Amino acid sequence: MGTILDKIVNQKKKEVAALYETYTPVKEKRKTRSLVKALEQFTVIAEVKRASPSKGDINLHVDVRKQVKTYEECGAGAVSVLTDGQFFKGSFYDLQTAREESSIPLLCKDFIIDKIQIDRAYEAGADIILLIVAALTKEKLKELYSYVLEKGLEAIVEVHDEQELEIAIQLNPHVIGINNRNLKTFEVDLSQTEKLGKRLNEEKLLWISESGIHSKEDIIRVKRAGAKGVLVGEALMTSSSIHTFFEDCKVNI
């Protein structure tokens, strides 16, 4: 059967093959915006997320322009956009739309397995690329991280357990993302942030917490663990008051 992650990666291989047949990367360079700079103070990376394998449809018909504008007005330090179509109902068009609306750093949230996806994200306006350790071999991770640097972009290298963390640390990346969600089962455990955060604090690396953050209490918990930011999707996409969520994030620890 394979895990959810296996299914997603298999789908990505098909998409990459199709991209090589239909897409020619542009050579033009452009200015990019820095997440590292945004993380100088505690930052919310606010996500545009229409659906997910674990929750099904979340906010399928979201107005991307309006959502991104609200995020920026409320004080988001960056915006994350799901570009996976099959499992998350996103698209590169959503990323492009967000870029047209937003002046803050943009993260392309996808399952990146090939350089051509990075080219596509760059053209659509991404400043930051998510690289998921669980989805890549060590060699491929290193190759894609180098390519991110070559393009003048930043990377969030995502980990879920100790083994993945050690692989990520070897890269000395811009930012490490601790995903509280196990991508093999899609179960969430916020204690992963506390567990892995200790090691990252020792290494003095910049890191954020991702997934399962829904309340002021969750924000306090990850801040105490040493996170410099949070990536929040579902809670914001279903919130009746996005402004209140951002106010809760300003709590001092």
Curated annotation (Swiss-Prot):
**Catalysis performed (reactions):** 1-(2-carboxyphenylamino)-1-deoxy-D-ribulose 5-phosphate + H(+) = (1S,2R)-1-C-(indol-3-yl)glycerol 3-phosphate + CO2 + H2O
Named in its record, the pathway it takes part in is: Amino-acid biosynthesis; L-tryptophan biosynthesis; L-tryptophan from chorismate: step 4/5
List the keywords (alphabetical): Amino-acid biosynthesis, Aromatic amino acid biosynthesis, Decarboxylase, Lyase, Tryptophan biosynthesis
Q: What's one GO MF term for it?
A: indole-3-glycerol-phosphate synthase activity
Give one GO biological process term: L-tryptophan biosynthetic process
Reply yes or no: does the keyword GTP-binding apply. no
For the keyword Lyase, the answer is yes
State the family it belongs to.
Belongs to the TrpC family.
Q: NCBIfam families, alphabetically?
A: PRK00278.1-3 (NF001371), PRK00278.2-4 (NF001377)
Name the UniProt record assigns to this protein: Indole-3-glycerol phosphate synthase
Per the UniProt record, the source organism is: Bacillus anthracis
